[in-house]
Amino acid sequence: MSFTLLDGGLSTAIESLGESLNSSLWTGELLRRDPEKIRDAHQLYVDAGAKILISSSYQISFMGCKRVGWSEEDVHSALLLSTELARFSGIKVAASVGPYGAALADGSEYRGNYKVTFDGLKDFHRRRLEILVDSKPDYFAIETIPELREAQAILEVITEIGSEIPYWISFSCSSKQTISSGELFSDAVKIVSQSKGAMAVGINCTAPHLIIPLLSDVKSHLPFIVYPNSGRIWDPETKTWQGSDNDALSSFEIKKWVSLGATIIGGCCSIGPKEIAQLKPRSLD
């Protein structure tokens, strides 16, 4: 039942260090204010046994950062720094590429159906992807993607800029068959599986009880990557997670996920270093 252990939610680890995150840039805000806190949070996951770390660039985009007064130079520097902060000996770094909805800071990454053109989506992703290529990560973590159109836009940009960095695309999902936009997860898997350079396709920031039906419904030559949250629901109005996560791993049916093709497993929101440490022995079975 062996699998590669991914880290958990970066914000969860940072909050465990006593930091309050209420900026629209979330963990990305610390890239300017206190980058060592990000480094310390990554260290918690290394100590917990994670073999892949996802960088702090999820919220960093030219559009989103401009809204809070960052210069273009600030954005460029932050993107490069985010990868550097996640470098540890023997650990792989996945540069996070968050969705367009993350820059809107209104929970759109859990809905999709953005009011933006296809070319607008490509322009949004192109500049930061070009910079992240220069940061030389091991992988791209293209994550929490809520709609097929955005996945297609990113795939076109990757081809156009000539990136050869392996990547995964993981989708936020809303039901046993659909991603957040209401489109079929099976169609999402098909799009990624047909693309050049993809190393995995999967699911993140999704309730863990949905993972088995989602994976059971699809076939792919690519391995699956799975990193659900604890099952709590994000409230964009209060910017808080609603519900209990007293036993965050109770719905993590790891053995079944692996049998369905998952080879990389970790956690997302509200899954912290403690939970990743609990998963480590299971990754070695």
Identify the function of each model-found stretch.
Residues M1-D285:
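Domain-level signal for soluble alpha/beta catalytic cores
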